[in-house]
Amino acid sequence: MTPPVTVGVDGFPESRAAADWAAREAVLREAPLRLVHVEDWPHTPFMPAVGQLENAGPVGAEELRRGADAVLEEMTDDVRRRHPGLQVSARRMPGRAAAVLAVQAADSQMLVLGSRGRGAVEGFLLGSVGIATVGLTATPVVLVRPPREPVPAPAAPAAYRDVVVGVDVREDTDALLGFAFEEAARRGCAVRAVHGWSLPFAFGYAPQLDPGVRQEVADGIAEALSERLSSWRRRYPSVKAEERVLVGAPAVQVLYEAADADLVAVGRRIRRAPVGGHLGHVAHAVLHHATAPVAVIAHD
């Protein structure tokens, strides 16, 4: 049986955007789609209804469950209408959202989540469930933001933009590049590999630096990046791969290149310690500020 693409849904606009993106991804992968709604609320007789207006008044847990079932049914029907022929299943499960979603991701090709909109500060904010879930699963996790305007069901296949991938040539990049090339091959688009760098302060201020040193470092990074891409270029000869070695903070450079991307892929190192962060600063910044869907790929 083909593993599904799993998407977490709760009825909010972010999860609806995630469900639509996940459905299109499932079609590309020729995989079934699984919608999961997690009952993650306090166990009290009465509580505010999730997804309802603040002045809707308290409702019981059973009514919340009926509301969740209605959301699942409505979203399932909408996906089937927009993507006829796609196999869709839905399930409602109790528990803590991040933990349940991580378990559901274990037998999936991919987990897709909605990412919240703008917060009080400039830029987007990633919800705590998204951050926690990314750190709990080795399955690729894609965070999707809602479009500013509703996206109609496509009448015909549209051309895809590039898949942008942030590459640190000092890290193990096989899983990350493999994901990026595979996604680009499915879409018939290019891969744009981005590495941002700057000289350590030990080299002194730029005006005092021998230009030859800067060029030597840049050439070394470009060679390392090209070497990382070489085996994937051979494996996916139909995928055009572009290299971007840019001076500046890596997160800033990836975000700049991602502005016109169809999908952005970043890596995260698997950390087995029970405490501490599970996201590096580049992945963290891209997740919070990129407008395109962001895929987080775990690696050792």
Please report, for each region that a protein language model flagged, where it lies by residue.
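Structural beta-alpha unit
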Residues: 1, 14, 62, 66, ...
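Small/aliphatic-rich secondary-structure junction motif
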Residues: 1-56, 159-211, 233, 240-241, ...
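General small-molecule cofactor/ligand-binding pocket signal
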Residues: 34-36, 89-93, 142, 192-194, ...
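A short acidic, glycine-rich active-site loop
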Residues: 55-70, 211-221
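Glycine-rich, Arg-bearing micro-motifs that act as flexible, cationic patches
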Residues: 110-132, 160, 263-288
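Short beta-strand elements of ligand-binding domains
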Residues: 114-115, 141-147, 295-298
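Short, structured interface segments
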Residues: 130-151
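Structured core of small recognition/catalytic domains
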Residues: 189-266, 277
